[in-house]
Amino acid sequence: MNYLDRNEFNFEPSQKVVEAIKNFDPKTLCFYTRIYDQGKKSVISVRLSEIYGVDESQVLLTYGGEDMLKNAIHYFLSVNSQTGAPNTKILIPEFSWWYYNRVASECGGTFEMYPLHEKEDTFAYDIDEVIEYTNRVHPRMLLLASPNNPTGNGLTPEEIGRIMENIPSDTMVLIDEAYASFISTDTAYIAPLVNKYSNLIISRTLSKFYGLPGLRVGFGFIGKGHDQFESYINKYLGYNRFSEAVALAALDSDEHYRKVADDMEWGRQLYKKELGSLPGFKVYKSVANFILIKYPIAIKESLMEALKVQEYKIKFMGDKGLEECLRITLSRKEQTQVVCDTIKKCYLQTTAQK
């Protein structure tokens, strides 16, 4: 089965990752890490500190980006750390990952959805609207997804800075950047932002750009002054030492993953060229490892069957407002070609029957 429905990695891991796995000494697992004795969390956090220019104490490590989101939302929606008064509201973008809502509900939090706007062939945040909405509601948390799943749009560093500068300083901002780096390689904005704004968390992962969702390594960066949260999220006895070895190899393999990102760009252009001009289709711009496509709903059943026969799975969206959309993981060229050709063939067959 070809899984193009969960934004996984249909490519080979880097050679450095393969070698790290082959050369890992199983005896290492018989002992805890000793780096915590040096006042550090992990060899991963030390390396991330070097790469991103953020103090190691402000680097967060979790078991996947999912764990980062859950820890942050559960912690900050429980009790307002400054006043002791409960403030359980979080603002979440419309047309975003359903998991955000569920995590907020798990800890008794309440959520409101703020608008994400469709503009021609893209979705976009209205920055002034986000600022106005946040000031009016004054939530404990504001969640921004950049890139956003499933719409594929992102925020610029300038837009993030404008939001941070103009909202209440006691609203904790959580930016989910799980799908970052496929288009822009800029990370220089992260250190200045987390050093300037104490109410900011930027969450990333090795699951998407680095193609290791099965490794379950998430990381992030937090503004200064959150010792209690850092203690809450850190692991006293350290982290999975096998994951550490593989993660270090992945972080040292950018050249490999940039080539993969180039193949994904080829896929974006193929979908745009082959499907974008067909009546009833709209191929949305995406800066993530997936693409959202609006399609004629009349071909849904035949398309599902055709993909099933060829052992391909893509995401048929069911979210309100996106019921006529497909989300397809960008994958190897031959896989992309099969999916694109199948969609086009189903469309042409359906229109020929009318």
Positions of PLM-derived features:
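Active-site phosphate-binding strand-loop segment of PLP-dependent enzymes
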Residues: 119-182
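N-terminal small-domain helix-loop-helix segment of the aminotransferase-like
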Residues: 1-64, 68-71
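Conserved PLP-binding catalytic core of the aspartate aminotransferase-like
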Residues: 265, 275-310, 326, 330
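PLP-dependent aminotransferase-like
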Residues: 77-140, 144
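PLP-dependent enzyme catalytic core of the Aspartate aminotransferase-like
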Residues: 158, 309-310, 315, 320-354
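Short acidic capping loops at alpha-helix termini that bridge into adjacent secondary structure
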Residues: 55-59, 86-89, 170, 177, ...
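PLP-dependent aminotransferase class I/II
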Residues: 12-14, 107, 199-277, 281-284
